[in-house]
Amino acid sequence: GVVRTLDDFREAHDPTYKILAPTTVYSRDLKPAKRYLITAAQNATPVHKVWWRGLQTMTKKLGAELLVIPMRYKNPTSQWSGSQQNAEHWATEVRPFLWNVRHPLNANLTVLADLKVQPTMSSPLSGAEAVSLESSGIIGHTKLQLRSIPTAPGRMAKLLTTSGACTEANYTDSRAGRIGEFHHSLSAILVEVDGKRFHLRPVHFDAKTASCTDLDTRYTAKGSGRAPRPLALVMGDTHVDAICPLVEKATFGEGGIVETLNPQHLIWHDLLDSYSVNPHHAGNPFNAVAKRQTGTDDAKAEVQRAIEFVRKRTTKDTFSVIVGSNHNDMLRRWIVSNDWRRDPVNAEFYLETALAMVRGTKLTGKGTEYPDPFAYWFRLANVPNSRVLDLDESFMLGGVALDMHGNEGPNGSRGSIHNLRRIGVKSIIGHGHSPGTDEGCDQAGTSTRLKLEYNSGPSSWLNSHVVLHADCKRQHIFIIEGEWRA
């Protein structure tokens, strides 16, 4: 017959083509709640029994509403019989919790359950940055990915994250299927709502311990209890002289993150701000005037403040690790390029530092090597239970690399979460001030105020840390208006 429409053409030329029935709407009368657990389930696929029971434990203990976002995937090679007979078939356990409509959890966070994304999509958040408008958003997907999205000046950056899954990995015997299976994450997003404010944290199932950890609590199929001490707290870039007082209190104050979680290690990125010797101020007389008026042009005093900040916050049973960072390195850049004769305020400190660097300079097989000036002064201060890492010095805990700041990428390129996500080991970095999760890499945010002199315009900066739990799972902790949990 005559082909009249696109559907006629497809049906005539593609024997596998069929017009799908209208989408079934899954929702229920959802009462406003303080906490929500959000995950995803693949069609015609069983739940992971132990993880599902752990989710039930969390739901009960936290008094949370559980939302399971349904995902469709055609898999003719599925090991589970009949998986392709009905695209609308879901495991019995998840059916009462299915949710596939768009729904605001509060004024600033929306569940984008109507956004259907294939489980094998390598970047499930791609293109969805504006879908939720000014609201943060959660998208159902088996691969965990998180981004901080820039917003207009004067507004807090928004978060976009996927949910992780509660069902077993069930992918085709293909390249895309194998990659999808590799990134399949048994996880969920825990949301705490407090008026217009919300707190959002990913929770990961750990097969070795058959549990998941949220902050200081471990959940299993049988119950909950105190979680073991985390291996480390990787803090958003510190910049001591520019640190936000609310973030400092939330992190180190009474009832704060460090007191509550009691991490074994504190990992410091951009500890030193180097405002006194910032190379970007060169030639700007107004920066010089402002610094002279406030005494913030004294490099030695700034270095000492940074060192003492660590000393006062490193307890007897905690170990501090200072990661080599680009702002710490500004001290070296100042020594290399500046003339002490033109800087009487810092002349003595400059000469003393330069002399130590000269005495430590040597020519090796790699080329010229000389001491890092900030590392030199930090070691000279003898801060107990602390260590400052040299350039390219490895430091790993639980199989996760914690030694990279994030400013340097592969083969001399500029670093980013994107080009550090596939280097063969998991990692937690800083540098960008914009929190994120992308495959093997997590990026902490910043501990500074969210608006500084060098981030004008739309910004994706957020105050956040990343905790490395005892089970080696990583979890973002966001500090919103001085609060880190509801």
Language-model regions, residue ranges each:
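Extended recognition/assembly regions associated with phosphoester-bond processing machinery
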Residues: 1-486
